[in-house]
Amino acid sequence: MNSKDSNTVPVYTTNTGCPIFNPMAAARVGKGGPVLLQDSHLIDVFQHFDRERIPERVVHAKGSGAFGEFECTDDITKYTKHTMFSKVGKKTPMVARFSTVGGERGTPDTARDPRGFALKFYTDEGIFDMVGNNTPVFFLRDPAKFPLFIHTQKRNPQNDMKDATMFWDYLSQNAESIHQVMILFSDLGGTPYSYRFMDGFSSHTYKFVNDKGEFYYCKWHFITNQGTKGLTNEEAAALDGSNPDHARQDLFEAIERGDYPSWTLYVQVMTPQEAEKYRYNIFDLTKVWPHKDVPMQRVGRFTLNQNPTNFFADIEQAGFSPSHMVPGIEVSADPVLQVRTFSYPDTHRHRLGANFEQIPVNSPKCPVFNYSRDGPMNVNGNQGNWPNYPSSIRPLAKVQYEPDEGHEKWVGQVTYHMDEITDVDFEQPRAFWQNVLGKKPGQQDNFVKNVAGHLSGAISPVRERQYGVFTRVDSELGRRIREATEAEVKKMEEKAPKPINKGEPHMFQGSS
């Protein structure tokens, strides 16, 4: 908030630089007379005020972030030619944004929800965005389901309230979601203590390409150096009321006092030959690559050491997209990732404008030359007098690219495909229940309690269907979820006043 010269008090001006006598005074006819339209400053203030809000993100609306740098600590040039990893010790500036997913900008940081984990690297060859979550999997693997799923995480269109029946109705009909559900309703995955104490994941499978044109499949893991820490349902609920900005405050204050948070990047790498023989579909967003199958390899470390100067300019206007790629890193055949490469920049153009890449936080540090021109809010010189077409007089050079043609040849007929549910979809959720939660004292009990408290708000047919999904994971889990949930339902029914039906039926009336 300080001026450039701390000894000089800035003069208040209009947005065009004209000094103003008193910003809180209005031109009027006498002391008590009407306001005059000639007071252009007053008119400008209100016109700008009327336009201060931009559309919030349709997902990940509530978030926080900071600036920092990534340092390469280990050589992976045999996998990728990307300049960020070109040599050990190489440093790359970056900005990070962490967020909840389903809520609006005003919702609590401690809501049970996945957390967004978005990173923007200002590399020598352009912007590279890694747009992940704090969970290694997601609720779906068929991209057409994404908007429908997100609708169920939002509000009931009739009463604009969160609705447990909507939430579980979708999940119980789409059982591939169960792996993410298991993580979400654990204390670590669904209610992390704060952004500093959670890991981040690419979730998707990406491709590394080296300087020989050879490619490898990879998954990215950002492991917090602060250690993971979660909240119980009760702790999260208490913070919801006492400090809904808890995670934002924790991140900001830690950086302000010099306690800079950091994360270590590891990758899992698989050759195309290994991928063809692997027991799981490597493009399935609902599954992980077990570390015993594909070991983690350390790559580097990023540290956040600078808070935003202005939240709106630096964080709210930041636009992250999986389509922001650089040489040496490419999109795989993961269908959800491929659709995200369209959806994310599209929503930024709606939210921030056609030239959102020119906003300082979104601008690359390297030169930009192409044939894109004009459009609203084009403020970077519009590439001067360079031709806006492929010119023989002032040509642009082209980089060399020789793809590996030995793999990823796709031949087939056009079909409308949706993956079917099989027993394989329950293997990893079962391992999470038995081998992860089962080895941490109290975590299975907390999981059952967390699910029961939420699922009890859904109508009976939806609850029954979801019990069946949990039973396919583990019969004991299904039994415990059913007993705990129905006990919660009974308590709610005993406390609830008798309903009075008037007018039109609600969205789910008659279904229970």
From Swiss-Prot:
A molecular-function term among this protein's GO annotations: catalase activity
Enzyme class, first EC level, given as a word: oxidoreductase
GO CC aspect terms: cytoplasm; mitochondrial matrix; mitochondrion; peroxisomal matrix; peroxisome
Domain of life: Eukaryota
UniProt key word Lyase: no
Gene3D superfamilies from the UniProt entry: Catalase core domain
Cofactor requirements of the protein: heme
Record-listed heme binding positions: 344
Keyword Transmembrane found: no
Basic and acidic residues: compositionally biased ranges: 488-505
Its EC number(s): 1.11.1.6
GO terms for biological process, alphabetical: cellular detoxification of hydrogen peroxide; hydrogen peroxide catabolic process; response to hydrogen peroxide
Residues covered by region (Disordered): 488-512
Reaction equations catalysed: 2 H2O2 = O2 + 2 H2O
Keyword terms of this UniProt record: Heme, Hydrogen peroxide, Iron, Metal-binding, Oxidoreductase, Peroxidase, Peroxisome, Phosphoprotein
InterPro entries: Catalase, Catalase_AS, Catalase_clade1/3, Catalase_core, Catalase_haem_BS, Catalase_immune_responsive, Catalase_sf
Pfam assignment, any one: Catalase-rel
Active site: 60, 133
Modification Phosphoserine, positions: 363
Disulfide bonds: none
Localization of this protein: Peroxisome matrix
Protein family per UniProt: Belongs to the catalase family.
Biological role: Catalyzes the degradation of hydrogen peroxide (H(2)O(2)) generated by peroxisomal oxidases to water and oxygen, thereby protecting cells from the toxic effects of hydrogen peroxide.
Protein name: Catalase
